[in-house]
Amino acid sequence: MSHHPMRLTIVGCSGSYPGPESAASCYLLEAEEAGRTWRILLDLGNGALGQLHRHTDPLGIDAVFLSHLHADHCLDLCGYYVMRKYHPTGAQPQIPVWGPSGTAERMARAYDLPVDPGMTEEFAFHAYGDNGGVVELGPFRVEARRVVHPVAAYALRVTAGGRTLVYSGDTGPCRELDEVAVGADLLLAEASFRSGDDNPPELHMTGADCGRTASHAGAGRLVLTHVPPWHDPADAEAEARAEWSGPVELARAGATYDI
């Protein structure tokens, strides 16, 4: 860890499904408190657990925060359940998993487990309120804010040591994201759609939408993520740059940011 209050590692950033260069969505955040490094995950999409081994011991994660329950954001919790339950060093202590209401049942179904106990011995499942809520864990303060998507979905505002990362999760452009993103040092925003395509409303954002959100928020920098393998990420970057003059870059697997 550096002297920076919070470090972000892009474990996976491919939109909608794993691509040839990256697993699906997963972001590792690390911060120091009381003489140790705390580690949380924002999402754990398909393919991400394998890549997580490259960056840290997966058994050392303190909590998982899920933005929503689509497969590309939550499904590797199944493998993580196996790892924590059956690891040769013994069953691991239960850790909290925060997500929308119904997360425990969704993950039990995904693994074809009886809902009781499901994964509740390995993970202490907690639900955000309908509109969101605030969680404090070690050095981290995590604020969840309901955004617009076909399922219950949340943007996550994470603060540690006076520095702030805002992760859009999956969302269309909305007032709620604009509000929760205000003052973000780093805005990690999804750019699944291309401007000019026939894009359904309240589903995903374009690079231009991300640029406008960053501008409205007065963000320190914008990192574009969740571009699906069928699009060219350079298009999203160009769109964002046309809307916002601040620093823009494309998320790539393995990249780290000191915030």
Pin down the residues of each PLM region.
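Binuclear metal-dependent hydrolase catalytic cores
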Residues: S2-Y167, G172, E179, E237-I259
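Cap/insert and terminal regions of metallo-dependent hydrolase folds
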Residues: P173-D258
